[in-house]
């Protein structure tokens, strides 16, 4: 499939004082503490698109999707060229495999050594970071992937374009049985053609794909038949697991794969709402008011996967990619108890030093009165089990 992609870009909002952060955290904990409240939270058969105070997807006069918030700004071709030509690249990714193995080790995921342990069947939740925005989530008797990319390059061609400097921790053939895949948008580092083909070849119609509005035709051309295409605030489920609701929720970004298809496909985040756990996947996003809306409707979440990388230079990137401080604000806005860092340490997509995002994240957490366990960073291939049923969680 011959495809091409360019980059665009984005205003920081007001800061939260530490007291406000603690107040919102306490509110989130109090609203989801007891067993009875955890099970009573499953009441999602409302159509949130009918609510007056939710931000609905919007199209311009040309019929293409647009970001509906003042926090978005389109960049012209001269702005893109200035970034590509004039801005200094500080990423400094070493060519030495030994140095990379020391700084960013790639672990063998637990499910390769002990495949029989895959699948959390109790009330807990387990996540495994497979690099970039690819996360394997096990919760509420389901296993699903977010934005799977197992290829060496995030590009229409495996001979050019952004190349991984950290390999994927596993192959698709080594994955446990996957029930669903969540796609946030159609950029090459989030929607990888080769990974889609390989996942479909392995799992076929047993695998349900949840994709944004406008992507159904592309998925069907790849041979995928079990595809659910959703607008913001629409929901669906995996057959046989109707107690777990997948809601496509807003984010601030853009879409493009070819020269002429700008924003013909919607972009967004995902809220996964189960009887025991709630998971939020931010996808790729700039900071915007949508996250408070999501937290208001579906919070508190037990875990969120939030991007922390590809943010420099800010005057170009801020509209489409949050920096670590804005990632912490999303953590607060969606009312999540824990967050994990994604979208860093895999591809050099922007100009910050390749090891800077976790450092900036810890600095931001300290400013907001949070600790590293509230918003944690995993190694490639590393898993984290969260006992979400523990009253102290």
Swiss-Prot record:
UniProt binding sites for deoxycholate: 256, 260, 348
GO cellular component: early endosome; early endosome membrane; Golgi apparatus; Golgi membrane; nuclear envelope; nucleoplasm
Regulation: Activated by divalent cations. Activated by bile acids.
Reaction equation(s) it catalyzes: an N-acyl-1,2-diacyl-sn-glycero-3-phosphoethanolamine + H2O = an N-acylethanolamine + a 1,2-diacyl-sn-glycero-3-phosphate + H(+); N-butanoyl-1-hexadecanoyl-2-(9Z,12Z-octadecadienoyl)-sn-glycero-3-phosphoethanolamine + H2O = N-butanoyl ethanolamine + 1-hexadecanoyl-2-(9Z,12Z-octadecadienoyl)-sn-glycero-3-phosphate + H(+); N-hexanoyl-1-hexadecanoyl-2-(9Z,12Z-octadecadienoyl)-sn-glycero-3-phosphoethanolamine + H2O = N-hexanoyl ethanolamine + 1-hexadecanoyl-2-(9Z,12Z-octadecadienoyl)-sn-glycero-3-phosphate + H(+); N-octanoyl-1-hexadecanoyl-2-(9Z,12Z-octadecadienoyl)-sn-glycero-3-phosphoethanolamine + H2O = N-octanoyl ethanolamine + 1-hexadecanoyl-2-(9Z,12Z-octadecadienoyl)-sn-glycero-3-phosphate + H(+)
Chain sites annotated for binding Zn(2+) 2: 189-190, 284, 343
InterPro entries membership: Metallo-B-lactamas (IPR001279), NAPE-PLD (IPR024884), RibonucZ/Hydroxyglut_hydro (IPR036866)
Modified-residue entries (N-acetylmethionine), positions: 1
Tissues of expression: Widely expressed. Highest expression in brain, kidney and testis (at protein level). Expressed in adipose tissue (at protein level).
Region: Disordered, residue numbers: 1-40
Chief localisation class: Golgi
Cofactor details (free text): Binds 2 zinc divalent cations per subunit.
CC cofactor: Zn(2+)
Compartmental location: Golgi apparatus membrane; Early endosome membrane; Nucleus envelope; Nucleus, Nucleoplasm
Topology with respect to the bilayer: Peripheral membrane protein
Residues holding an N-acyl-1,2-diacyl-sn-glycero-3-phosphoethanolamine: 188, 321
An MF annotation (GO) of this entry: zinc ion binding
Record-stated family: Belongs to the NAPE-PLD family.
Free-text function comment from the UniProt entry: D-type phospholipase that hydrolyzes N-acyl-phosphatidylethanolamines (NAPEs) to produce bioactive N-acylethanolamines/fatty acid ethanolamides (NAEs/FAEs) and phosphatidic acid. Cleaves the terminal phosphodiester bond of diacyl- and alkenylacyl-NAPEs, primarily playing a role in the generation of long-chain saturated and monounsaturated NAEs in the brain. May control NAPE homeostasis in dopaminergic neuron membranes and regulate neuron survival, partly through RAC1 activation.
Name of the protein described by the UniProt record: N-acyl-phosphatidylethanolamine-hydrolyzing phospholipase D
Lineage of origin: Eukaryota, Metazoa, Chordata, Craniata, Vertebrata
């Amino acid at each position: 499939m011959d495809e091409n992609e360019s980059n665009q870009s984005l205003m920081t909002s007001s800061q939260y004082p530490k007291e406000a952060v603690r107040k919102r955290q306490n509110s989130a904990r109090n609203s989801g503490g007891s067993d009875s409240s955890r099970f009573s939270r499953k009441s999602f058969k409302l159509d949130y698109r009918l609510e007056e105070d939710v931000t609905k997807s919007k199209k311009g006069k040309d019929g293409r999707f647009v970001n509906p918030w003042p926090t978005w700004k389109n960049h012209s071709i001269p702005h893109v060229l200035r970034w590509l030509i004039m801005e200094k690249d500080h990423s400094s990714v070493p060519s030495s495999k030994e140095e990379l193995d020391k700084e960013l080790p790639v672990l063998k995921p637990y499910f390769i050594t002990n495949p029989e342990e895959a699948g959390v069947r109790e009330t807990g939740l387990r996540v495994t970071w497979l690099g970039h925005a690819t996360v394997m989530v096990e919760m509420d008797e389901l296993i699903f992937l977010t934005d799977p990319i197992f290829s060496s390059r995030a590009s229409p061609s495996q001979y050019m374009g952004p190349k991984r400097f950290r390999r994927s921790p596993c192959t698709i053939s080594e994955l446990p049985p996957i029930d669903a895949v969540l796609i946030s948008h159609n950029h090459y580092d989030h929607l990888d053609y080769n990974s889609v083909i390989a996942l479909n070849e392995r799992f076929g119609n047993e695998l349900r794909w949840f994709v944004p509005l406008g992507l159904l035709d592309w998925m069907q051309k790849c041979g995928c038949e079990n595809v659910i295409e959703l607008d913001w605030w629409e929901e669906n489920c995996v057959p046989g697991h109707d107690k777990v609701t997948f809601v496509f929720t807003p984010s601030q970004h853009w879409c493009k794969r070819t020269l002429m298809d700008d924003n013909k496909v919607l972009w967004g985040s995902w809220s996964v709402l189960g009887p025991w756990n709630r998971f939020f996947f931010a996808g790729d996003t700039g900071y915007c008011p949508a996250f408070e809306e999501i937290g208001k409707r579906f919070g508190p979440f037990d875990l969120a996967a939030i991007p922390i990388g590809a943010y420099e230079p800010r005057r170009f990137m801020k509209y489409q990619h949050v920096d670590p401080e804005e990632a912490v604000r999303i953590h607060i806005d969606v009312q999540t108890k824990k967050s994990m860092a994604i979208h860093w340490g895999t591809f050099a997509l922007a100009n910050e030093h390749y090891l800077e995002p976790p450092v900036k994240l810890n600095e931001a957490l300290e400013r907001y009165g949070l600790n590293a366990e509230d918003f944690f960073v995993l190694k490639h291939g590393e898993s984290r089990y969260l006992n979400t049923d523990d009253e102290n969680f």
